[in-house]
Amino acid sequence: MNNYKLTIQYDGARFKGWQRLGNNDNTIQGKIESVISEMVGKETEIIGCSRTDAGVHALNQVANFQSDEKLVEHKVKKYLNQYLPNDISITNVEEVHDRFHARYNSKAKTYLYKIWNEEHTNPFMRKYSMHVNKKLNVKSMKEAAKHLVGSHDFTAFSNAKSKKKSMVREVYSLEVMEEAGFVQIRVSGNGFLHNMVRKIVGALIEVGLGQLAAEAIPQILEAKQRNQINCLAEASGLYLENVEF
């Protein structure tokens, strides 16, 4: 069986997320599977590295699919980009080992979150960032971020859909940056629970607004109570930035 790795970019604003929900749904997975199935002449499933939610974007999503026939990578890329909607782009196609699995073989993921932090709205970024109109205390946010780096039980930063055997995840790095009206948050880790990144960003926003003390983060982690974080950052500001294998 021939196995092909896809690197994908998409604007998630109008989609219901990555994961296919039905035969004719408006999802990234569904759109790509439909075109690949047409190309190879049989129903074909793709496996994505990250099941991004509705409204979330990707700069480097990775997926794989298998085919009975040998395919030419550049022709696959050309075909997919010709027939996919223009808010989904295949940036690379690569034949890989038949055991390669986009979800199970990933070693690290990096997400970027964009906050538009000006009093006025930014009409050009409304689908691609979260607007916070009060000035954020970035210094306090950076202090809070330090408490989240490392291996922790992140139950408090998940939602009820997170039903993993272990809620322990390792955050390798968590950066808070200011740039031209934006506050950007970049987080890397070995894996993330459902809504974990958006909850982390939400907690940092609460700290930045003075609604939560940076020093309270360790106690929140220890308590493992989901109701401790009131802010779930909007999907629009979240980007899957990179995946490492």
Swiss-Prot record:
Signal peptide range in chain numbering: none
Catalytic reaction equation(s): uridine(38/39/40) in tRNA = pseudouridine(38/39/40) in tRNA
Classification via Pfam families: PseudoU_synth_1 (PF01416)
Binding site for substrate: Y111
Domain of life according to the entry: Bacteria
Keywords, ordered alphabetically: Isomerase, tRNA processing
SUPFAM superfamilies, A to Z: Pseudouridine synthase
GO biological process: tRNA pseudouridine synthesis
Coiled-coil residue spans: none
Name under which the protein is recorded: tRNA pseudouridine synthase A 2
Gene encoding the protein: truA2
